Amino acid sequence: MKTHILCLGDSNTHGYCADPKDNADGGIRFNENERWTCRLQTALGDKYLVTEEGLSGRTTVFVDPIHESMDALSVCYALLKSHEVIDLLILMLGTNDVKERFGANAACIGAGMERLIQKCKSVDCWGGKTPNILVVAPPRIKEGFHDEVMGDGCVCLLYTSPSPRDMRRSR
């Protein structure tokens, strides 16, 4: 039986490419040779099954007033159950949490991630084993990146990040 790894994330997990000139195929989604999830699958080999659950715009817990069902918290039960048994869950979220419309600071984003982790642990998808969750910090937003989607919130991600100590404190 293969070891099942589920990668739950946002556009970084989906493989969204903001500038098609940066993509070998010239499209808006990186190909299987470029996406980190596919590279992980290749590196691990046939004894593992790496599954992408990436969605552009996905947040940890923040309900988007413009686009519905974008928060991982409200959909994680169904997502995790649809992929059970999960041996490792990789969470790579937080970039979209800094959108200006959410008004969240680093501590609030960290608390949201902790809430999502606790919810994921409670889902019966682990085959009777202890939940195994790896949180990967999203890459920094490049300086000067600002648009109508992210707003001024992207400046927050340049200079702050949720404290891993604060996230561990509630365990």
Where are these regions (language model features)?
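Conserved SGNH/GDSL esterase-like catalytic core that processes O-acyl groups on lipids
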Residues: K2-L6, G15-G127, N132, K142-M150, ...
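Short hydrophobic segments within beta-strands
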Residues: L8-G9, V136
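Short glycine-enriched loops at secondary-structure junctions
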Residues: A137-I141
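Single conserved hydrophobic/aromatic residue that forms the stacking wall/gate
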Residues: Y159-S170
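Active-site His/Glu-centered metal-binding helix of metallohydrolases
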Residues: N12
